[in-house]
Amino acid sequence: MELGNFVTDLNGKKCVKCDKDAKFTGVDPKKAWYCQECFVQMVRNKFRSSLSKKKIYKDADARDTLIVFDGTLSGTFLLHQINDALKQITYKRLMVKPTVLVLVSLTEDTEIQMVIKRIQEIKKSVLENVRWVVAHLACSMYDEDFKLKENECNGVEKISDYNQLIASCSVPTYRKELERVLKEKCLQKIACSMGILKCMVPDHADDLGRLAIDQLCLGRGGSISTLVTVTDKRPDFMLIRPLCDISKKELAVYNYLCDIDKHCIHIAQQNNQQKSVQTLTDAFICTLENEKFYSTINTVLSTAAKIHNTSIGKDDSKCSFCNVEVADSVCSTCSAIRECTGDLLTLLF
């Protein structure tokens, strides 16, 4: 039987948590099946567990957190989890002081204005008493402190510089990696400009599993643990990935069942998919999943979490651009990216 685009099964399966008929499954349909109520609770528990295990908010003075909303199904899920957690009046209440960052990569002014208008509507029903800020990925190009304004898209004056830098990278693989690193720099600069030390991003398990393989191919195998696990601590900034154990499929089913996918909006620029390490990784994972190797992502992530760099970076030396542990000031991948950009990257950073 099909419910929307989500596979269900009514042929005698029982929920693993209660005695009701099971209709929904997680990543692997050969394993646990759930009724609707237990499936929703299972996904919520994964989110809360990722935060509680690391005791991220044990310090009462460091609860200010930037919540990144990128318009995707995972971004929508994250937004609603924070909203629900703040409404709790028991021990389940999440002790966090959120500021929502709407991260945009669109370049047309009319599209950006439509996003701002849509955000005004969403704010009426989700986190209405929280500060919202709209910013473009081009904020990564600021070389000095800047003040964020409300009710407008910050960083639009830097879009041409951002596009010029991305276009200057001639190798598709390095271009995609440059975009990823610039996104992290954008988040860090925005957080620092607001005096916030923590940033919660909507990266789900599928994204992180693919990222782990990408980074192996780019020669960063010793650093993939920090890139795909819950916390990524940096000198003045921490990235938090509370969706790292939740698959894209689970998020899609949850959003559908809870009727929150209506808050997904188009924020990201669609780029031409030239052949690169990243596109090949995606094709490789899709092939395995189509051949019913459902646990591929889980296996990759569980293995990646155990890999730690023991030969270099013992003195906490980091790449000055991407922040991975290296023996030198710049990792080999970032050095290659700098060469591809014709030294434009060196001039800017």
From Swiss-Prot:
Among the GO molecular function terms of this UniProt record, one is: sulfurtransferase activity
* Record GO biological process: protein urmylation; tRNA thio-modification; tRNA wobble position uridine thiolation; tRNA wobble uridine modification
> To which species is this protein native?
Caenorhabditis elegans
Pathway, according to UniProt?
Answer: tRNA modification; 5-methoxycarbonylmethyl-2-thiouridine-tRNA biosynthesis
Compartments it resides in = Cytoplasm
- Please give the Gene3D superfamilies that the UniProt record associates with this protein: HUPs
Name the GO cellular-component terms: cytosol
Concerning its family, UniProt says: Belongs to the CTU2/NCS2 family.
What is the role of the protein in this entry?
A: Plays a central role in 2-thiolation of mcm(5)S(2)U at tRNA wobble positions of tRNA(Lys), tRNA(Glu) and tRNA(Gln). May act by forming a heterodimer with tut-1/ctu-1 that ligates sulfur from thiocarboxylated urm-1 onto the uridine of tRNAs at wobble position.
Keywords, in A-Z order: Cytoplasm, tRNA processing
The record lists the membrane-crossing segments as: none
This chain's protein is named: Cytoplasmic tRNA 2-thiolation protein 2
